[in-house]
């Protein structure tokens, strides 16, 4: 890997002369060491040179180039390997000018265990070879629906192995015809294995084979005069027919297909992923790039070259995440990322002397015998003409599928921006991967449905955003605040939760960019106070939250002042006209909401006064009569009169939303802590007593009561327990 040393003045020519004509990955850094962009290249020297030798770069790329202070490159053996490395680096480094999809939690699977009598179960996580996995499914609901179908048709067990091994009579599921009760040998191992095999074929989309086998089995029982068994198989066929009839509109000839639709609307982009597993359409999931309002035009859905606001967009990684209340999307410079994606000079533009013999007309898949509805996409030199949709789709495919299972068919609304991505997917999957851009028949219907769902999701998101922005504006107007950019309004809300003084926890939730930022939520374990003292708990959490922030800000201000004095000594013209006030620094909120009345607000005022913070940002939310929503009163710490808002107030709706989220976050944490405490033995809390010593104590005294009743001498007689440790244990238990 090449790592040129960073200097005060970046010299591109010196760096470019050292670059090889080999495939690899390049990274641009700014003066602070932050990664600006990660890209791949067939020829590193030509690709990187294109940024510094071209005279007609777009304004956005030119702006990025001016920030480059260092270039690093990594040579790979092939372009496919470079694509994999590029994808990994984008995920790890989250560069400002790359489109980044935030890793969502793993998709759910339906698992058939490797037990003698396999159990079917809902599963998330890494897969192994001991069990069978079917999926992934787009949602937990899709998995559970499939489990219910398999219970109704094949009657496979769902109980834990520990329950299965200890049952002496069938459970309720057997009585209602949802399990064949292998736990009590109500079915033979051979027959149960046949049901498992049929269930596997059903999940793989081979329903016809299952029906044929069941029909043959029914006739065989009838010919042997085993009419009860024949009737049972007939009922099984009837259940399966009912299921297939109910899902006739969803079932196609394909086994596994993913449908990817990209839609730009109202300044936002949505990627809608629909999944077909075993021929059944299992639903879809929408992903949205955050903060692209200024990057796309409302009318055209494309980038607006004249929008100068892009240069000042907020910094941070671009995050495509499912929009939820309290989502974890970080502030992002998506405008820059999307602009760079569109305006980036084509990789092969400098390679006019290479690949002159390439011919168009190859289908975008591996192998021969492509489906008749396969897109006639051709290997492209440079970027696709699909605009930003193709760029976003390529980013999604790379970050969603590389390293994960790839279905044999991808139906897409736009062609990926580069051919190499498809080649890498094929190499990784080990089977043919067909990318269809103009599907026919059922696949076409699926794509149209995915595009429609993407538009609906975008319309819903835009409507919710408009409502949320209106609430933010109403709150600032109500509080008499002047805020030039409402997206930068940051609200933090605190709540205290405990059960009769037990497991006291404080929560802090954050509202920023017109939505809850759950990745910035924090819980604080409150200790060293009288149980149930909410005032002391509030003092502790506010002090812990803001004390370090203020101290760090003071240190930063001192460093800046020293630098200014040094510069002023060298050049008196640089001396500041007047000393500026020391800011609190960090990520201070604009408003701090306190869930409580005058008492809690007074405690907060005292803490803020001690820390030198503005008490004007403190707002208490006191519950009204009967604790009914809509009767809350806002209490201020700076002497303003309490303010009662009407039930229909948009400002009150926002305050209630944030307050309720703080309460939810606090109470869930408190319950988890309380449950953990109650399930933990007192011996686990003893200092100096690990697992082995704890086991010896329990073996000697028979349990916790015996340990508590033991004297110091009895404790010291246990192997590994010294006299000093025995005295310490005795003191902690009494």
UniProtKB/Swiss-Prot annotation:
- UniProt-annotated location(s): Cytoplasm
- UniProt record, GO biological process: nucleotide-excision repair; SOS response
Family matches, as SMART domains: GIYc (SM00465), HhH1 (SM00278)
Indicate the principal place this protein occupies in or around the cell.
Answer: cytoplasm
Keyword Cytoplasm tagged: yes
For the region Disordered, give the residue spans. Answer: 345-386
Bias kind Acidic residues: ranges: 346-365
Q: Offer a single GO CC term for the protein.
A: excinuclease repair complex
UniProt keyword terms in alphabetical order: Cytoplasm, DNA damage, DNA excision, DNA repair, Excision nuclease, SOS response
GO MF term set: DNA binding; excinuclease ABC activity
Where in this chain does the record put each UVR domain? 208-243
Q: What InterPro entries does its record include?
A: GIY-YIG_endonuc, GIY-YIG_endonuc_sf, GIY-YIG_UvrC_Cho, Hlx-hairpin-Hlx_DNA-bd_motif, RuvA_2-like, UVR_dom, UVR_dom_sf, UvrABC_protein_C
- Specify the GIY-YIG domain's residue ranges: 21-99
Q: Could you tell me which Gene3D superfamilies the record lists for this protein?
A: 5' to 3' exonuclease, C-terminal subdomain, GIY-YIG endonuclease, UVR domain, UvrC, RNAse H endonuclease domain
Q: Which domain of life is it from?
A: Bacteria
Residues in a coiled coil are: none
Which family is this protein grouped under? Answer: Belongs to the UvrC family.
In UniProt terms, what function does this protein have?
The UvrABC repair system catalyzes the recognition and processing of DNA lesions. UvrC both incises the 5' and 3' sides of the lesion. The N-terminal half is responsible for the 3' incision and the C-terminal half is responsible for the 5' incision.
User: Oligomeric state and partners?
Assistant: Interacts with UvrB in an incision complex.
This protein's name = UvrABC system protein C
Q: From which source organism is this entry?
A: Paraburkholderia xenovorans (strain LB400)
At the highest ranks, the source species' classification is:
Bacteria, Pseudomonadati, Pseudomonadota, Betaproteobacteria, Burkholderiales
């Amino acid at each position: 890997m090449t790592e040129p040393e960073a200097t005060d003045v970046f010299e591109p020519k010196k760096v470019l002369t050292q670059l090889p004509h080999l495939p690899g990955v390049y990274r641009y850094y700014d003066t602070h060491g932050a990664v600006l962009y990660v890209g791949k290249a067939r020829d590193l020297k030509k690709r990187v040179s294109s940024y510094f030798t071209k005279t007609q770069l777009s304004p956005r790329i030119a702006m990025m180039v001016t920030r480059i202070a260092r270039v690093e490159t990594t040579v790979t053996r092939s372009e496919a390997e470079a694509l994999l490395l590029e994808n990994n680096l984008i995920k790890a480094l989250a560069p400002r000018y790359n489109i980044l999809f935030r890793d969502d939690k793993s998709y759910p699977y339906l698992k058939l265990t490797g037990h003698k009598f396999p159990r079917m179960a809902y599963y998330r996580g890494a897969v192994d070879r001991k069990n069978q996995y079917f999926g992934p499914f787009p949602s937990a609901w899709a998995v559970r629906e499939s489990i219910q179908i398999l219970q109704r048709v094949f009657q496979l067990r769902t109980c834990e192995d520990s329950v299965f091994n200890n049952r002496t009579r069938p459970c309720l599921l057997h009585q209602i015809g949802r399990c064949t009760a292998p736990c009590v040998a109500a079915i033979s191992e051979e027959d149960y294995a046949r049901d498992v095999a049929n269930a596997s074929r059903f999940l793989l989309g081979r329903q016809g084979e299952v029906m044929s086998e069941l029909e043959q089995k029914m006739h065989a029982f009838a010919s042997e005069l085993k009419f009860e068994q024949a009737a049972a198989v007939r009922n099984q066929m009837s259940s399966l027919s009912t299921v297939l009839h109910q899902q006739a509109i969803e079932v196609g000839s394909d086994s596994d297909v993913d449908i990817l639709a990209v839609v730009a609307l109202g300044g936002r982009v949505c990627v809608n992923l629909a999944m077909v597993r075993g021929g059944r359409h299992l639903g879809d999931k929408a992903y949205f790039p955050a903060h692209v309002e200024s990057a796309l035009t409302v009318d055209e859905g494309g980038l607006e070259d004249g929008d100068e606001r892009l240069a000042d967009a907020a910094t941070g990684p671009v995050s495509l995440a499912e929009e939820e209340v309290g989502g974890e999307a970080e502030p992002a410079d998506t405008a820059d990322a999307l602009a760079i994606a569109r305006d980036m000079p084509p990789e092969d533009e400098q390679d006019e002397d290479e690949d002159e013999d390439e011919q168009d007309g190859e289908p975008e898949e591996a192998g021969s015998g492509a489906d008749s509805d396969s897109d006639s996409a051709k290997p492209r030199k440079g970027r696709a003409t699909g605009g930003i949709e193709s760029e976003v789709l390529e980013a999604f495919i790379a970050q969603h599928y590389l390293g994960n299972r790839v279905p044999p068919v991808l139906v897409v609304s736009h062609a990926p921006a580069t051919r190499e991505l498809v080649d890498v997917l094929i190499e990784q999957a080990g089977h043919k991967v067909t990318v269809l851009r103009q599907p026919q028949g059922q696949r076409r219907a699926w794509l149209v449905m995915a595009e429609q769902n993407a538009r609906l999701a975008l319309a819903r998101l835009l409507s919710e955003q408009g409502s949320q922005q209106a609430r933010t504006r109403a709150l600032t107007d109500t509080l008499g605040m002047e805020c030039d950019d409402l997206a930068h309004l940051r609200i933090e809300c605190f709540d205290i939760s405990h059960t009769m003084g037990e497991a006291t926890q404080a929560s802090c939730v954050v509202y920023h960019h017109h939505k809850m930022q759950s990745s910035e939520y924090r819980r604080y374990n409150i200790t060293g106070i009288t149980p149930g003292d909410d005032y002391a708990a509030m003092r502790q959490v506010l002090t812990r939250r803001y004390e370090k922030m203020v101290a760090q800000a003071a240190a930063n201000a001192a460093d800046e002042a020293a630098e200014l004095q040094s510069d002023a000594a060298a050049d008196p013209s640089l001396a500041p006209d007047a000393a500026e006030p020391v800011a609190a620094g960090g990520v201070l909120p604009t408003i701090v909401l306190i869930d409580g009345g005058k008492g809690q607000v007074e405690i907060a005022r005292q803490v803020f006064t001690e820390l030198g913070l503005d008490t004007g940002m403190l707002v208490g939310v006191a519950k009204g009569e009967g604790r009914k929503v809509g009767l809350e009163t806002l209490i201020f710490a700076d002497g303003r009169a309490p303010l009662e808002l009407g039930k229909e107030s948009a400002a009150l709706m926002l305050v209630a939303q944030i307050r309720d989220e703080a309460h939810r976050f606090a109470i869930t944490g408190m319950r988890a802590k309380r449950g953990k405490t109650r399930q933990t033995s007192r011996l686990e809390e003893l200092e100096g007593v690990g697992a082995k010593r704890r086991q010896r104590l329990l073996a000697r005294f028979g349990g916790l009561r015996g340990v508590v009743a033991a004297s110091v001498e009895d404790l010291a007689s246990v192997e590994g327990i010294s006299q000093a440790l025995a005295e310490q244990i005795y003191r902690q238990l009494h």
